[in-house]
Structure formats: C-alpha cells, structure tokens
Amino acid sequence: MKLKIDIATNNFKHGGGTERYTLDLVKGLNRQNITPAVYATKFDHGIPEYALIEPHLVDQHRTLKKLRSFLFSSRLAQTRKNSAAKLIACHHADYADLLICGGTHLGYLHHMAQKPNLLDRLAIRRNRSNYATAKLIMAHSHMMRRELVGLYGVPPEKIQ
C-alpha cells in the first residue's frame, strides 16, 4: 500500500520560511515516489515543484484578509473531508499527524514585550488548538520547544 500524504500550507510558492520548507518536503517525498496532495490558499503554477503535487485549493477568497489565518483550519477540514491521508501541517491546522512549528505567538509577544490585543488572543487560541490536536510537533529550535512546553503546556514527548 502506497503512503498517502497531505500537506497543508498557506501559499505554495518560492519564498522563505514555511514556503521553502514545504517545497523541500515535496521534493523529498517525490524522491521516495510519493506524490503529496498539497492544500493551499494560493499556488504558483509556474514553479517546477507544482508538477510534483496534487493541488487542492483551500478557498478563502470570501474571507476577510485579517481572519483568513484563523479560519484556515476549518476550511482545510472541509476541503479534505474525504482524505484518509496523513496530514503534515506547515500552516495553522488542527488534527495534524505532524505539525511543523517555526514559531509561537505567545513567544513572539513575550520577546517583543507586547500585551496581546484581540487578534493576538485569537492567534493564541488558534495555536493552543493546533498544538493540542496535533499527534506530533516538530519544533525548529530548542527555543520553540521551550515555548511549546512552557507557554502552551505541550507534553515534551509530543515534540520532536
């Protein structure tokens, strides 16, 4: 039986951070003869990696721009409702088999010495849900690991 992988990301394009990580992940899976289904709000059809995926649009064009990140997880769930594949989340998504964590909102606020406003509180709530429902979390640094455990109460054994 061939392994089926879904990847959730905001934008499938060349860029920094999670965009680069997503493209590297797609290329690595392709070398293993796995064609992932990629769920994203936007796709760059002109990049070579586009030919290596099965694209699925997470439609958010009717959602207010400031709220898109908060509603991505529910739109993703609707879009992939018939998928039995393992989910790798490179963007905010609940119930991921593997959640990629490059930063936490509480950590950002702490390091910037800022108090949370309404949008920050929504982002923190979204983070808590994403971390609580993920089976595994890959923290990109020791600092991320400390923030996940210390600020969000994520069990250390859940973090890779």
Give the residues covered by each predicted segment.
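Membrane-proximal helix-turn-helix segments that form the acceptor-binding/catalytic region
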Residues: 119-140, 145-146, 151-153
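Extreme N-terminal starter segment of soluble prokaryotic enzymes
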Residues: 1-6
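N-terminal strand-loop element at the rim of the active site
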Residues: 9-15, 28-64, 153
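Active-site proximal beta-strand in glycosyltransferases
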Residues: 88-123, 138, 159-160
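A conserved, positively charged/aromatic
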Residues: 78-80, 108-117, 128-135
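An amphipathic, basic-hydrophobic alpha-helix
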Residues: 61-87, 120-129
